[in-house]
Amino acid sequence: MSQGKIVQIIGAVVDVEFQRNEVPKVYDALKVEGTAITLEVQQQLGDGVVRTIALGSTDGLKRNLVATNTERAISVPVGAGTLGRIMDVLGRPIDEAGDVQASDHWEIHRSAPSYEDQASTTELLETGIKVIDLMCPFAKGGKVGLFGGAGVGKTVNMMELINNIAKAHSGLSVFAGVGERTREGNDFYHEMKDSNVLDKVAMVYGQMNEPPGNRLRVALTGLTMAEYFRDEKDASGKGKDVLLFVDNIYRYTLAGTEVSALLGRMPSAVGYQPTLAEEMGVLQERITSTKSGSITSIQAVYVPADDLTDPSPATTFAHLDSTVTLSRNIASLGIYPAVDPLDSTSRQMDPLVIGHEHYDTAQRVQQTLQKYKELKDIIAILGMDELSEEDKQSVSRARKIERFFSQPFHVAEVFTGSPGKYVSLKDTIRGFKAICDGEYDHLPEQAFYMVGSIEEAVEKANKMSAKA
């Protein structure tokens, strides 16, 4: 193994000089002697000097320290040994529970499966969240993005999806915490532990306080672990169905921006790295389903300043099958989950995939909400009395639909004090169809707020009338 010496340190960027005939390849991992720091080669500058990004704090590094080339990319433990463990970007355990007992190590830089190996499916994944199941259904083996600005509930929605899908899902899950709050990572660990599904989850964290190199690569570490479960065939010759949760994809882009600036690249639009589309593509193209197994990924995407046209969320949109857009306006009405049903989309929204009843109900709900949106200006200026009877009826139903989209979450029980509700797809379609048909025109709209199925809304209305 060739050895070089550190010649320059500028923040997270470290230059290392090697013999001219022993220059490491781009993405090779270098180990710095006497420290736990790993460097990843990013550029070859010529004259035997390579520019690297440090995966870890460079505090205490000094010039002339020896760096050894491992002659391979960063490799992380994969397989059953990773389940129930919390690891960092290099696959080192950070849960103080001993070493990770892994039979194999895989490099984090891998190519996406070839076209012939890929497989698509139209099987639906029920989430138990009414607004998602009705308006933007998820596909098994699909890619889902939760878009939202600061504080509208991306992480809470993701936790509820983990709660509803991962616990009911017999397969394995991988959670990659990319540049998010350490507290949320801690909450997630305890949530999994308390519900006895920890032995089916591998957790990889690169949190907000870590250097940009860690935050940039931690998504690839988590993805590599998920790929192993998908590709490793069991006795029947099949891989596994894996759930991959990434919170937050925007922080991955942001870390790429920091690294790009540190490496001296010219920034592009809004200061992002010039390689934004390529970096996103490299990650997203690997998150796919093959003939042996599937990866269903749910990714939270922070939207800077609530601007969906920002280059980072706009680049992410192109890769997803379903987009769930969280709206600050809906959150301000106290309707949670604050999903905007008119702005959320799904490729599964096709009568041949989801069935005619589901499709027709979703379309009617959308039309009713759209009509209400158009009438809001008239209502604000002239009031409800100036509307025709038909329009009044549409507005009344739309307001009931809006409130019926709200739902108490299991993961928010400690804050709301009301028990979480899981609503099956069949009950969801039945409830919204009945509201559109006018079967519940006689009930007050408040009865539809924060309930599960339509029967609960009727029960709540009866209680309200009894109190009155």
From Swiss-Prot:
CDD domains: ATP-synt_F1_beta_C, ATP-synt_F1_beta_N, F1-ATPase_beta_CD. It is found in: Cell inner membrane. Its EC number is 7.1.2.2. One of its GO terms (cellular component) is proton-transporting ATP synthase complex. The keyword Ion transport applies. It is a peripheral membrane protein. Signal peptide: none annotated. It catalyses: ATP + H2O + 4 H(+)(in) = ADP + phosphate + 5 H(+)(out). GO terms for molecular function: ATP binding; ATP hydrolysis activity; proton-transporting ATP synthase activity, rotational mechanism. SMART domains: AAA. ATP binds at G148, G149, A150, G151, V152, G153, K154, T155. Keywords: ATP synthesis, ATP-binding, Cell inner membrane, Cell membrane, CF(1), Hydrogen ion transport, Ion transport, Membrane, Nucleotide-binding, Translocase, Transport. Belongs to the ATPase alpha/beta chains family. HAMAP family: ATP_synth_beta_bact. F-type ATPases have 2 components, CF(1) - the catalytic core - and CF(0) - the membrane proton channel. CF(1) has five subunits: alpha(3), beta(3), gamma(1), delta(1), epsilon(1). CF(0) has three main subunits: a(1), b(2) and c(9-12). The alpha and beta chains form an alternating ring which encloses part of the gamma chain. CF(1) is attached to CF(0) by a central stalk formed by the gamma and epsilon chains, while a peripheral stalk is formed by the delta and b chains. Produces ATP from ADP in the presence of a proton gradient across the membrane. The catalytic sites are hosted primarily by the beta subunits. This is ATP synthase subunit beta. The lineage of its organism: Bacteria, Pseudomonadati, Pseudomonadota, Gammaproteobacteria, Lysobacterales.
